[in-house]
């Protein structure tokens, strides 16, 4: 049967002023917003928990806590968030934001049939982004995103949706398109890293398969019939790269 899962997020520095106030924890060049502190973050976390309870009471099957795509969760988890505060600086402090969020949602909704999971940007593709080796480098280091996935799994998450990039900054990484699709293979690499790290019962869902479509793309060195969404989705599920794929 189909499952109905709400995505919960706060846009942070990506908020549109016509909809909500743009805020940040450390101004990022080209974005920024009003700098907020620990009290405001704790209030936002309260609202996440309230939203999850509303979803549960409405009959939803679960929630996806978005730690991806440059939203507030990403902004806190990034190495770029190197300030000295409750959720800033060393990884052990930054990751605690996500761990606390999952624990608080599960405590508020103890029903084990209510699914909790997260969409994670494994590598945002710019200096200091998620999956980078430090606050001023873009070199890939999956230590933190893999530890994040394991940590939320230990706290009750039953699925992880793999993603990458930040659409406002690295769109071609986040959403490979037919014109420049090559970065889609990075997604497969990130998916396999997650699948190898997590428990067999934790569902890993892979992203970026839509670019393959019916084989009409500009990926080279493959026969068209081996370059489709159907082919790669089935292959990667069979090969143990992912358990499911996301389309959209």
Q: Model-derived features: where do they sit?
A:
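Flavin-dependent oxidoreductase catalytic cores
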Residues: 1-247
């Amino acid at each position: 049967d189909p499952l109905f899962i709400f995505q919960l997020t706060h846009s942070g520095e990506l908020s549109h002023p016509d909809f909500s106030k743009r805020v940040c924890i450390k101004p990022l060049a080209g974005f920024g917003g009003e700098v907020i502190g620990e009290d405001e973050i704790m209030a936002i976390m309260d609202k996440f928990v309230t939203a999850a309870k509303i979803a549960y009471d409405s009959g939803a099957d679960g929630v996806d806590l978005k730690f991806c795509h440059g939203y507030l969760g990403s902004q806190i988890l990034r190495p770029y968030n190197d300030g000295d505060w409750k959720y800033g600086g060393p990884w052990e402090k930054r990751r605690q934001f996500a761990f606390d969020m999952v624990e608080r949602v599960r405590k508020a909704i103890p029903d084990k049939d209510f699914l909790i999971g997260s969409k994670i940007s494994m590598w945002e593709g710019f200096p200091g982004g998620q999956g980078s080796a430090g606050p001023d480098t873009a070199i890939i280091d999956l230590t933190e995103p893999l530890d994040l996935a394991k940590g939320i799994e230990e706290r009750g998450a039953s699925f992880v949706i793999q993603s990458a990039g930040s659409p406002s900054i690295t769109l071609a990484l986040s959403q490979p398109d037919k014109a420049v699709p090559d970065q889609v293979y990075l997604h497969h690499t990130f998916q396999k890293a997650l699948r190898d790290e997590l428990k067999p019962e934790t569902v890993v869902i892979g992203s970026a398969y839509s670019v393959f479509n019916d084989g009409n793309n500009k990926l080279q060195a493959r026969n068209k019939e081996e370059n489709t969404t159907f082919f790669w989705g089935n292959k990667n599920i069979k090969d143990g790269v992912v358990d499911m794929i996301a389309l959209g």
